[in-house]
């Protein structure tokens, strides 16, 4: 069982397309929640991206990668990893603006969802 929680804010510096089913002519649609149709990034994909980046940074003989994320696919049933990622929610979205190039837009619903998730992880003020 996990004993500590941390909230992370992710910022995309390039366009993002999550892997999910192709729909018609669009072959890389954004993954969405079924019940709200809001964009979402699966925690498993975030964990895989973080693991991949650390794999490139850590020396090959360093065992921390397996301790943090679990064994690779050959030994996946040996033990679980020490970290877990939940799904990421979209809070701000870049929108083209005639006066400023781009601005970040949000909604009361997106802010309320973010506040609720942060409170669940123990953050009381923001």
Where are these regions (language model features)?
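RNA-binding basic/glycine-rich loop and surface signature characteristic of RAMP-family CRISPR effectors
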Residues: 1-126
């Amino acid at each position: 069982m996990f004993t500590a929680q941390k909230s992370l804010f992710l910022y995309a510096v390039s366009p993002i397309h999550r892997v999910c089913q192709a729909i018609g002519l669009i072959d890389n649609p954004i993954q969405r929640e079924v019940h709200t149709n809001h964009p979402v990034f699966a925690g498993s994909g975030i964990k895989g991206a973080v693991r991949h980046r650390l794999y490139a940074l850590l020396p090959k003989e360093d065992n921390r990668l397996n301790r943090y994320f679990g064994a690779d696919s050959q030994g996946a049933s040996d033990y679980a990893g020490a970290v877990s990622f939940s799904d990421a929610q979209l809070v701000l979205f870049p929108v083209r603006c005639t006066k400023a190039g781009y601005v970040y837009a949000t909604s009361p619903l997106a802010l309320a969802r973010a506040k609720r998730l942060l409170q669940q992880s123990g953050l009381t003020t923001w």
